[in-house]
Design a protein with these regions (language model features):
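A cross-family phosphate/adenosyl-ligand binding-site feature
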Residues: 1-53, 60
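Short glycine-rich anion-binding loops that position phosphate/pyrophosphate groups of nucleotides
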Residues: 13, 42-43, 69-72, 142, ...
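Glycine-rich phosphate/pyrophosphate-binding loops
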Residues: 91-113
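Short, structured loop/turn "capping" segments at alpha-beta junctions
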Residues: 58-61, 97-99, 127-134
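Hydrophobic/aromatic ligand-binding patch that stacks against planar heteroaromatic rings
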Residues: 86-90
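Glycine/threonine-rich flexible loop motifs
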Residues: 72-81
Length: 228
């Protein structure tokens, strides 16, 4: 086999959970079969538990694969994505990590994304990348045979999301739904949006450091020249 897989997943959909950890209530884990567990927490909780003590040293993890997410994680999505956040947590804990998402349209070709994930694992086994790098992989919703290949990409950028939707609960009180994500704004050649739209698997290298290093001196001047 390619690998021995241990599944630790949220017990329900936690889309948009980002990097949140559950700190104010205890987490409960249910076992649904050999090496298959569900947690009443976030994707980040799942990875943290799996690597940091859930198995009491019985399992030696060497990689984190998050997904397959039912939907795109392109551009700004990575800031909100629980799928990407789970991979980031794996990197925090010192393991190579991949986030896999299927850009679902109509066909829902999860078998395509699974095959791409297997190929990515083989590549990493043969030529490991530095553990500080996280790969964000988005797979077009196509039969595998129709994929045009893989592309190394950068994150694009979306238009702002649609306005919130106001509704009423059964008691007539107002409730609000967050509007859907905006379409691609920066979606030209070289972006993850462009690759997927043209039938390519997008592979974007991510890092945790959000510092805008080129602006450090500019901010020092803005602060009055004090950059001590």
């Amino acid at each position: 086999p390619l690998a021995q897989v241990t599944v630790v997943a949220p017990e329900r959909n936690r889309s948009g959970a980002s990097n949140s950890l559950t700190l104010d209530v205890p987490l409960r884990v249910a076992e649904y079969g050999p090496r298959r567990h569900f947690v009443n927490g976030t994707p980040t909780d799942c990875v943290h538990l799996a690597i940091s003590g859930l198995f009491d040293g019985e399992i030696d993890h060497d990689m984190v694969v998050s997904g397959i997410n039912d939907g795109a994680n392109l551009g700004d999505d990575v800031l909100y994505s629980g799928t990407v956040a789970a991979a980031v947590e794996g990197r925090f804990l010192g393991l190579p990590a991949i986030a896999i998402s299927l850009v679902v349209r109509d066909g829902r070709h999860f078998e395509t994304a699974a095959r791409v994930a297997s190929e990515m694992l083989l590549r990493l086994q043969r030529a490991p990348l530095h553990s500080s790098m996280i790969l964000n992989v988005n797979v077009p919703d196509l039969p595998y045979e129709r994929l045009r290949g893989l592309k190394s990409t950068r994150l694009g950028h979306r238009h702002r999301s649609a306005p919130v939707v106001r509704a009423s609960d059964p008691r007539g009180r107002p409730v609000y739904w967050v509007g859907p994500a905006g379409e691609g704004a920066d979606a030209g050649a070289g972006t993850d949006f462009h690759a997927v739209a043209n039938g390519y698997v997008s592979v974007t290298p991510l890092q945790v450091d959000l510092t805008r290093h080129a602006a450090i001196d500019d901010i020092g001047e803005w602060l009055g020249g004090r950059n001590e």
